[in-house]
Amino acid sequence: MTSLQVAIDVLPLDELESTVGPLLDHVDVLEAGTPFIKMYGLGVVRRLRALGPGHLIVADMKAMDAGALEANMAFDAGADVMTVLACAGDATIEGAVRVANDRGKRVVCDLIGVPDKVARARQLAGLGVHMVGVHTGTDDQARGADPLADLAAITGAVDLPVVVAGGINATTL
């Protein structure tokens, strides 16, 4: 299944409703991006939940430690999905997955910065993650990285939904 997700990364907080409101009929998933959460706190997840009660809400926590704690924080704020960095230790990932499973939520493991994305995606599947994220970071994009380069290899390697982020636009599609 293909879903369209919009990430709110950098936006004045007072423009959230006027920016997201017109998008609600056109997107399936609303994401509180990492910079947005860092700027304004997890309250932005609550606001996205209020704006799009029927939408899937993602908190891009990029957890690197304390997976269970961060998962609980994201889910308490109204997220359906939270992210953990794939380079985090297995215990961190397992903690987030355990909380997500207990609460009927999901975890995406973001492969940003992982050298062997296919091998790690296979390991993550074994840890029970619900989705893997193929994410080409802004800094890598500036150096000319192709945001879709790893996609085919990863989708062929794991039987998990794959989320694609970073550098996806009309030119790259």
Task: Label each PLM-derived region with a short phrase.
Residues 1-68, 76, 117, 124-127:
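Conserved N-terminal beta1-alpha1 strand-loop-helix module at the mouth
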Residues 4, 66-159:
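Conserved anion-binding
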Residues 5, 31, 57-58, 108, ...:
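Structural detector of well-ordered beta-strand residues that form the stable sheet scaffold
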Residues 7-11, 33-37, 62-66, 87, ...:
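Active-site beta-loop-alpha junctions enriched in small/polar residues
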Residues 15, 92, 172:
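Phosphate- and divalent-cation-binding pockets in alpha/beta enzyme and binding domains
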Residues 24, 51, 158-160, 165:
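Residue-level detection of beta-strand scaffold positions
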Residues 156-158, 169-173:
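Alpha/beta catalytic cores of nucleotide-metabolism and tRNA/nucleoside-modifying enzymes
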